[in-house]
């Protein structure tokens, strides 16, 4: 059986093999979407098909919405040719449940898939959709890189400069294309719309607004568009913030074989020339959270409660949910596992969770954070943390590696650990000196920077913009000689850039130095130190 609009009419055949077909009138919804489009989505990748498109499908099946989604792919046009067109815009979402069971469902809420290429006929159709008064929102999952218009040194990328010079006629960058389509909407009568970033980074709506506005301001300066276009962006276009949390790895061979055994044909995994790994199916974890700022000037779908843990709220709550995740309940645990996973030779996060010492370490990091957690009110931080420790991190079907998560650790330290230490320092009822697990992670990171694993062998370090600088301090320390530590860690541990506070001034610097010294006495000293600190029940 192949996946297409014809075969899904036989719902019983799909139900028989354990795949839930769509339960709404596709022809009717397609007709409505063509005439009165409400929702455009930029970036037709895995998290969109597995999570975002599924949220709308729920509403279609409940009769709460009557139009689907128009996808516009801005970056990798092969995705449209390989996994949208041949399968009539359908895909199979495979959710890996906590008990290891697979929940399978055909996602059919995408009614049109276009190439966001100004030299392709699809671009005219994209412009036509943006001129339609019915359009309520354009959401995006284009990865954080897609919003960047300048490099780390603050220089504009050459393609962005081209877009600024050429105006909205034939843009090449994602942000240039979004600005050009908004200009179409402006010319059609200043029609309102919300641009909703669903990419996983803080203050995502703010970043989207600033990139689109910067390009548009250059167009105004050069006389390529009317001055009022900026006024339109400020007054009639909303850029709501969001917090999204769901792990959707690349397509898995194991899931492909599982679907083929059920008799489903054509489940190939494609790697495009732009290195996108994509298939007609999506595999993902069960846990999910989506918190959206409720700012939609032209109305919106009935998103609240449209799926598990989907919330519409104010901007402050979105930011609190994001901070809860990145400072306490998920990201610090990830980094702790990344550091010790690299030192102890692990290749999978899920395998680390089988190590009682490492499981106890992340439980301890979570407990220390939860005392000062930012509580968003809509998500219970304790329940979120328990789900991360007991369900998400141990999931063997999510092939995440400590080496990948260890990338850019210097950029993550301030928010993932510094915020908690700072909060302990500022609270009269708490004392940073009583922290036990977070100092151990920081000592472990200093030990990691030596580039020697716990067996005493050289190990490759993950990319990090400050790596050279940090290595220059620890390179003077000799493995096997704790006394050679001397004052070499001081520039790292006193850095407010890294930890939000000077760790010596809050009573943690010396404690971390002592833990570090224990970890460099020789081979297997890291595990021994973990046993000593994590194995103890006292504070």
UniProtKB/Swiss-Prot annotation:
Pathway: Carbohydrate metabolism. One of its GO terms (molecular function) is oxidoreductase activity, acting on the CH-OH group of donors, NAD or NADP as acceptor. Gene3D superfamilies: N-(1-d-carboxylethyl)-l-norvaline Dehydrogenase, domain 2 (1.10.1040.10), NAD(P)-binding Rossmann-like Domain (3.40.50.720). It is an enzyme of class 1 (oxidoreductase). NAD(+) binds at residues 39-50. Keywords: NAD, Oxidoreductase. The keyword Glycoprotein does not apply. It catalyses: D-mannonate + NAD(+) = keto-D-fructuronate + NADH + H(+). It comes from the Bacteria. Its EC number is 1.1.1.57. It holds the Pfam family Mannitol_dh_C. Catalyzes the reduction of D-fructuronate (D-FruA) to D-mannonate (D-ManA). Belongs to the mannitol dehydrogenase family. UxuB subfamily. This is D-mannonate oxidoreductase. It comes from Thermotoga maritima (strain ATCC 43589 / DSM 3109 / JCM 10099 / NBRC 100826 / MSB8). The lineage of its organism: Bacteria, Thermotogati, Thermotogota, Thermotogae, Thermotogales. The gene is uxuB.
